[in-house]
Amino acid sequence: ITSEEVVGWAFSPTKSKIAFTLAEVLITLGIIGVVAAMTMPALIQRQNEKATVVKLKKAYSVLENAYRLAKEENGDFSGWISGNDKIEDTRVLAETFKKYLKVSQDCGFNSGCLPSGYVKHLDGTDYVDYDSRDNEYRMVLADGTALMFHLETNDYLTCKKDEHCGSIKVFTGNKKSGYKWGKDFFILDFTHNRIIPQGHYEDRYRPFEQYCNITDHRRENGTGCAAWVIFNENMDYLHCPEKLGWDKARSCKE
C-alpha cells in the first residue's frame, strides 16, 4: 500500500462520515449515562418504598392475627399481666404474642435485634438509641422484620377501651443501614380490642399532618406515618408533604 492510498483513506468522505457517526453514538451514550445517574436513585428509592409498604402491611396483618388468637385463648390482655411490674408485664405481653408468631431471633430486653445507634427523625436528626434501651422487649420475625413491645403508660392495666395501652414498634429495614422514623421504623398502638397504626385519621396523640411531615422539625416527627403507609399504600409524604392529608390528596399523583 502506498502513502498516497493511506492519506486518501484517512481523509475519504466515507471515513469522515463513520467517525462522525461514532462520535454521535458516544455523545448519546454519555447523555443516557447522565440521565440514568440522575434518575436511578429515584427509581431505587421508589422500589424500596414499595417493598416497605408490603413489609409493614404484612407485619400489621400478622400482629393483628396474633393478637386475635392470643385473646381467644387467654382473654383480654389485662388478664395476662399483674399490673405490679411494668418490665415483667412487658415480658409476659411479648412472650404471649410470640406464641402466635414465627420468630427467628428473641433478644428479650437485650440489644442485637435492631440497628445500633440513634434512630433518626423524619428530617434526619437523632432521636433515641432504641437498641440499647432495657425496657422494651425485642424480637425478629422469620422475614427479618424486627418488633419492640412496650407498655406505654403507668395505667396500662386500666387504659380505656379504645385508648392505647402500649405499642409495638416495627423495623422493616436492614440493620446495617441504620433506621429512621417513617422510612423503615413505625409504631402500632394496641388497645384492649385491637392494634391501630399511629397517625390514623382520628389520632390526636400523633396526627399524621404534624408527625409525618418531612419539612417539620418537631421531636418524634415520623412516628405518625404508619397508618398512611398501611391504608394508602404509599410513602408519598417523602415527596409532596404539603399536598397530602387525610382530608386532602392521598398520593402525589392526585
PLM feature spans:
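Alpha-helix exit/C-cap motif
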Residues: 64-83, 102-106
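Short amphipathic alpha-helical "recognition" segments used for binding
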Residues: 8-9, 28, 68
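Intrinsically disordered, low-complexity regions enriched in Pro/Ser/Thr/Gly and acidic residues
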Residues: 86-254
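N-terminal single-pass transmembrane signal-anchor helix
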Residues: 16-48, 55
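N-terminal leader/signal peptides at the extreme start of proteins
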Residues: 1-20
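Aliphatic-rich helix starts adjacent to a transmembrane/signal segment
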Residues: 40-63, 67-70, 74
